[in-house]
From Swiss-Prot:
Gene3D superfamilies: Tetratricopeptide repeat domain. GO terms for biological process: ERAD pathway. InterPro entries: Sel1-like, Sel1_AlgK, TPR-like_helical_dom_sf. Sel1-like repeats lie at residues 103-138, 230-265. Keywords: Repeat. It comes from Acanthamoeba polyphaga mimivirus (APMV). This is Putative sel1-like repeat-containing protein R850. The lineage of its organism: Viruses, Varidnaviria, Bamfordvirae, Nucleocytoviricota, Megaviricetes. It comes from the Viruses.
Amino acid sequence: MVTMDNSDKIYDLIGSANNNDVDSQNELVRVFVHNCFIRSVLTFAKPFKWNNIVENAIQDSNYTYFILCFHGHKYNRVKYQEIYKKIIDGLFLRISKSSSLDALTYNNLGFIYHNDIFKKNKVIKVISHYCKAVNMNSKHAQYNLATFIRLNYYKQEFVKLLSKTVFKDSTLPISKEIIFKKIYELYKLSASQFNPNAEHSLSTTCEFREFIGQKERDKWLKKSAKNGLSISQYSIGTKYLGGDVTNRKYQKGIIYLKNSAKQGDTGSQISLINIYSKEYGKNIMTNINEMMYWYLNCEQYTSFFMNIFDVFPIVCNTMEIDNKSNEENQNITNIETIILSKIQLLLVKIKYDCVCNNSITITNILDELENKFFKIIESRQKIQNSSSIFYISQMRLVDSVYQNIIDQQNKTGIIPFVKNYLVDEEIYMSIGFDSIEICDQLEILLNNDMYAENIVELLWRLDELCKEKSYYSKILKITNMLENYRSQVITFLEDNLTLRENYFFKKYKHIQRNYF
């Protein structure tokens, strides 16, 4: 069973549900209804593409509640209005033939009128349906009715309706204090049945101070965060960040923010971006990769990021290299990839700093370095192609071989990115197992040749520069060294191109090559 205590499994459940696995869809709906609201589901689930979603939403009150919660999310109300109309029409036809309804159906009817979903907002019907569900102890209706009253309590006509419905048995005049006491009671009833939204409302509604102390408010906020409400996780996370970074609460704050950010909470994502940017100097690879990860997952920042940088990161790398390693002739492609990823991260950091400091001009030296960086990428591809070491983005592999390469990449820590999407096997050349063996042999030859030419020494020096914290003063040195490295690589390529091609054709002429 999936709960918010093992919420990481929810993402697996969402993936299976989106692939139209019926059991996963049923379980995801059940978990969503039980938790009353899960931000990650609203962010990543695609119920409008599920098979039989209209029929299920008409017949099953759990599915109805589930799909109604998507109505106000992003542009769903406009994008899927035809689907919603079919559901609402079918639902009202079904209930017109039913002699009795369950609590969740009454709640759903109140929600439909409340949010004007193909039914004109009639306040009396909203209150009436919610009250019927509340009388059946629906935690969803308890929360929804409390919220509806809280948003409208100041209107005289609304108070008159309350006197005929919610407060029909009351002998006292209806005052603001009495109204908020009722709101508080409804929230507490809902929270006691596990409703993170109600728990959060108990902790944040200012008018409840007469009924609840700060200690209890904090308790409800923590409970709501533990139960998976992203806004509560964000609130606690930012609250804990006020202390020293080594403080235990600070580290807990990071965990809360990450849990919220994973669900798609923009505020948490932006907070993490800023935190890892400031912490850059302490750990170049960990912190900048973290910053980039949340940057690329932050919907609000993605378009902004694309306008600042020419492309998304080509490589994000968690692997380190050791020039004192006992391993003879470490793989030069791995070394080069790691160093180039560091250089690009330096560029990202510098440009990010310029943006955050409201700097209008990004200096020519940065553009020059970025230009040289991409020329290095091109040079590396030329080397690999010249020796028939097919770069993974230029070949299509049978599934088993493709998976083998991906597994190997996962072991090395190198994850290729191009334009913010993982390599897509649909664009690759089709080759077989023999070709993989050929590539391995030729890569060893290339590796040995480049070591023999002492080209790799430049890479070690580059890596040392990238490790230094005062990277601003090292930009020019890195730029010059990159140019030196590139010129040597190109010279090496030109000198060896014919020899290496002849070697390939002579030894492996039985292999058919299908170039684009």
